């Protein structure tokens, strides 16, 4: 009776275990064995047909009292030092074959003794049987392998997640700084960069996002129109500052540009690459677009009156620039012949003369003596990539070479300036400032919206 109860107990236990395995599928070593240190793997062969409960009963029954109370399987299982014994069986040709798995939390020696005890079992149920231990596996080694592999997976996941988070954090901080730099300008509270209140030149863009993108790339003198109608603040600023309109490369950008040119005093026009918006441009694209800016008069004439495309004008401008550079290279070699002196000045002088004569003669005969006087200085500022102004005294000697943005301040401080030669636009505001400083000659790239000419100041442009 006692044997029947034991067998039934093991049958139920094995059934529950089978159901759990069915539900859980394949489990990791950690789930299977818990705190197990070793696993005994054995195989058996019985000369007859036996079932799983017969094998389990034989293991418990035939080892009982064999190894003493300390290594009794039932006691060890109660205390958790031996796990559930797993048995797999299959019958073939009147014999039964199978495997036995015994999880153990005992030490190495006790586990080996227990494994050897299994091989003493010689009968399973009614049939003779033979059990052979195949190996004892160190579960801790398996766990170590599992830990290493799992740690690799966790680290890879962590690295994949951490890098974007770091980038997002950095971007958030930068956005916060840029937003702090953003100011509200004028009664309309227009979004603007921190340099707009005092900068000599400003960049007019369409919206707040455009100003933020320019701030991101270090351009701090931009101000936004914020809408389709041009605010009064922009109109006032355009009369006092050098204004560059920088609009999107789409239909909306063209409409805003038309309105700006009608109501504001715009000096230059720059556009984002065709189909792109200013807010999405990279630093390289922004710099390229601003360097390719076109004078406002040319935009009005070529685009709005003649109906040409803005980007065609830009390409033509680049081709013309490259053509001029090639022409200079061709003309330059014969120039030294009439001037044997080693100094570079005589070589440079004939070159602008020759070029100016070709352009000017068919149009008119304006002040050739003035061009001769300032030809050398005109060539110098024209060849400069940056905005540059030369301040000359009565002897035509350069007393200062400064950026154009510092011209107004320098003229207020100096009283010995006879002439100013620079590569910028001659505006009415600049004419008034120069005239008040006692300057006699003002030489610039071109004139724009000049309505008053002081009698004590001679104005010359490069084209004249």
Curated annotation (Swiss-Prot):
Transmembrane segments: none annotated. Residues 322-359 are annotated as: Disordered. Forms a ternary complex with MCM helicase and DNA. Component of the archaeal exosome complex. GO terms for biological process: DNA replication, synthesis of primer. Its EC number is 2.7.7.101. It comes from Thermococcus onnurineus (strain NA1). Belongs to the archaeal DnaG primase family. It catalyses: ssDNA + n NTP = ssDNA/pppN(pN)n-1 hybrid + (n-1) diphosphate. This is DNA primase DnaG.
């Amino acid at each position: 009776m006692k044997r029947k109860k034991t067998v039934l107990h093991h049958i139920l236990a094995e059934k529950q275990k089978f159901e759990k395995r069915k539900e859980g599928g394949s489990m990791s070593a950690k789930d299977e064995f818990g705190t197990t240190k070793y696993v005994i793997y054995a195989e058996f062969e019985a000369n007859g047909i036996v079932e799983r409960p017969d094998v389990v009963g034989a293991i418990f029954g035939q080892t009982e009292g064999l190894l003493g109370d300390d290594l009794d399987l039932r006691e060890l299982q109660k205390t958790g030092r031996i796990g559930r014994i797993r048995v797999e069986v299959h019958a073939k040709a009147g014999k039964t074959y199978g495997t036995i798995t015994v999880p153990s939390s005992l030490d190495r020696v006790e586990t080996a003794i227990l494994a050897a005890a299994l091989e003493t079992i010689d009968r399973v149920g009614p049939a003779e049987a033979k059990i052979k231990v195949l190996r004892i596996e160190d579960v801790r080694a398996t766990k170590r392998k599992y830990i290493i592999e799992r740690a690799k997976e966790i680290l890879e996941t962590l690295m994949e997640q951490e890098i974007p988070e770091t980038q997002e954090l950095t971007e958030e901080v930068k956005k916060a700084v840029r937003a702090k730099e953003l100011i509200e300008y004028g009664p309309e509270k227009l979004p603007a960069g921190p340099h707009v209140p005092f900068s000599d030149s400003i960049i007019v863009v369409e919206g707040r996002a455009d100003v933020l993108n320019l701030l991101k790339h270090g351009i701090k003198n931009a101000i936004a129109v914020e809408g389709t109608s041009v605010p009064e603040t922009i109109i006032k600023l355009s009369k006092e500052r050098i204004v560059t309109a920088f609009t999107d490369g789409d239909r909306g950008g063209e409409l805003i540009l038309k309105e700006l040119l009608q109501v504001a005093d715009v000096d230059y026009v720059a556009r984002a690459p065709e189909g792109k918006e200013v807010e999405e441009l990279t630093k390289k694209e922004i710099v390229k677009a601003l360097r390719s800016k076109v004078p406002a008069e040319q935009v009005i004439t070529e685009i709005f009156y003649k109906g040409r495309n803005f980007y065609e004008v830009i390409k033509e401008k680049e081709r013309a620039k490259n053509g001029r550079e090639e022409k200079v290279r061709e003309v330059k070699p014969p120039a030294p012949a009439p001037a044997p002196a080693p100094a570079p000045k005589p070589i440079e002088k004939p070159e602008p003369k020759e070029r100016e004569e070709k352009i000017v003669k068919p149009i008119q005969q304006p002040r050739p003596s003035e061009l001769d006087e300032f030809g050398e200085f005109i060539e110098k500022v024209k060849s400069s990539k940056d905005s540059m102004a030369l301040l000359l005294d009565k002897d035509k000697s350069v007393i200062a070479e400064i950026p154009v943005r510092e011209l107004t301040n320098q003229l207020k401080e100096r009283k010995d300036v006879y002439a100013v030669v620079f590569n910028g636009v001659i505006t009415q505001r600049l004419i008034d400032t120069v005239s008040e400083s006692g300057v006699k000659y003002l030489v610039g790239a071109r004139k724009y919206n000049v309505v008053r000419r002081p009698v004590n100041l001679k104005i010359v442009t490069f084209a004249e």
